[in-house]
Each structure stands twice: as structure tokens, then as C-alpha cells.
Swiss-Prot record:
GO terms for cellular component: extrinsic component of mitochondrial inner membrane. It is a peripheral membrane protein. It catalyses: a 4-hydroxy-3-methoxy-5-(all-trans-polyprenyl)benzoate + H(+) = a 2-methoxy-6-(all-trans-polyprenyl)phenol + CO2. Belongs to the COQ4 family. This is Ubiquinone biosynthesis protein COQ4 homolog 2, mitochondrial. Its main location: mitochondrion. The keyword Membrane applies. It is found in: Mitochondrion inner membrane. Coiled coil: none annotated. This protein may be expected to contain an N-terminal transit peptide but none has been predicted. The keyword Membrane applies. Its cofactor is Zn(2+). Zn(2+) binds at H118, D119, H122, E134.
Length: 209
């Protein structure tokens, strides 16, 4: 029997009201995603790399991923491409809010990790941060992780697109969903160990190409 913390109509109303405020979406995700986060936690426990991530609990912060240092790496590395992505958009990994509404510390870390690797997913999938690109990434996250916040962003966000973007999304969805289902489980990727990895090789090893 599947559990739901918040009824869908209530969540849709929230998303419409705040679309898409980072803080409100983050709170919504924590409140509605508890049982999905438990499922993600179990999948991580069943994988050796996932186990190491849960044991080490690495964080993605301005201190652990120093942009200026990343930009000194070879241009073809994952680290350099992530650093360029963040610098070009004036983003900071420190802007991600801390999980507050998941009382279990282990599950709170899992959800924090999900939020902190979001920009890595953008880089790996080669999608920017426009509304259209963000929605495509949310469809990928929905297919892989099943989180209610990603699901609502994917579906409700699609209505915010213009006609041309909606048509483009319909053409893109089969491919992005296929990539989500065939690729490695993104929460079991120890990104910190791939800073110097050629980004094309990383995409291939994760079956994202």
C-alpha cells in the first residue's frame, strides 16, 4: 500500500501559487517525498557505491567544489564543465537550502544529496537552466527517482511552456525517459571521484549517451 503525505490537489495548488520558488518547492519536496526518499535510501544501501556515499556523506558546497580550482582542470573533464556551468550562470552550490522537514537524519541526508547533485545532472544531460531545460531535467529525475516534487514540476511546469516549447518537449520526452531508465541510478554516482574524468567517458559509463 503506497502512502501519500499530502494530497495531490493541495500540492498542485501550492506549486501553482509558488511556481517555481526554490524555497517553497524544496519544502514541498521534503513534506511530500518521505516514502520515495526511503525507497531511494534502500536502493543506495543495495549498491556498493551507494553504501559508500551513505557512509561518507559527501557534501556539494563552495568549499568542497571550489569553482576557480575546477576551472584549472582540463576543459574536457567533468570538474571543469561543472565549474564552467556554475560560473557562467553565477550559481553557487551554497544556495541549496538545508533539509529541515525530514526528521530521520539518514533520510534527510539522502534528500540533501539529491538537491545538491541537481546541477551535476544538468551538466551530464547537457541541458541549460531555462524553464524548458529545467522541465526536461525534472522529467529525468521523475523517471529515475519518482519524487513527488520532480513529478509535479515535470507535469505542472509543462503547462507554462509556449506552443513551440510544448511540441519540442513532446519530441524530447521519449528520449529523456529512455535515458533515465537505461542509465545508472544517479544517486549511486560518487561524483566527487569523477572530477578529473573525461565528461564524455563519464556519460558513456553512466549510459547517458
Amino acid at each position: 500500500m503506497r502512502h501519500q503525505c499530502i494530497q495531490i490537489p493541495f500540492k498542485v495548488n501550492l506549486l501553482n501559487k509558488y511556481f517555481i520558488s526554490g524555497n517553497h518547492l524544496s519544502q514541498l519536496g521534503e513534506l511530500s517525498g518521505y516514502y520515495c526518499v526511503k525507497d531511494i535510501h534502500q536502493r543506495m544501501l543495495q549498491h556498493p557505491i551507494g553504501q559508500r556515499i551513505l557512509n561518507d556523506k559527501p557534501r556539494v558546497t563552495p568549499q568542497t567544489f571550489k569553482i576557480e580550482e575546477l576551472l584549472k582542470l582540463d576543459e574536457n573533464t567533468f570538474g571543469h564543465q561543472y565549474g564552467k556551468f556554475m560560473k557562467d550562470r553565477d550559481f553557487s552550490s551554497g544556495e541549496r537550502p538545508i533539509v529541515k522537514y525530514i526528521p530521520d537524519l539518514e533520510l534527510a541526508y539522502v534528500y540533501q544529496r539529491y538537491k545538491e547533485i541537481h546541477d551535476f545532472i544538468h551538466v551530464l544531460l547537457m541541458y541549460d537552466v531555462s524553464v524548458y531545460d529545467e522541465i526536461v531535467v525534472k522529467w529525468f529525475e521523475m523517471a529515475q527517482l519518482g519524487l513527488p516534487s520532480a513529478t509535479l514540476s515535470a507535469f505542472v511546469g509543462s503547462f507554462k511552456l509556449n506552443c513551440q516549447e510544448k511540441q519540442k518537449l513532446m519530441e524530447t520526452l521519449p528520449q529523456i525517459l529512455k535515458r533515465a531508465h537505461k542509465s545508472e541510478f544517479i544517486m549511486n554516482v560518487y561524483f566527487e571521484e569523477h572530477i578529473n574524468t573525461d565528461i564524455t567517458q563519464l556519460r558513456k559509463s553512466l549510459r547517458l549517451l
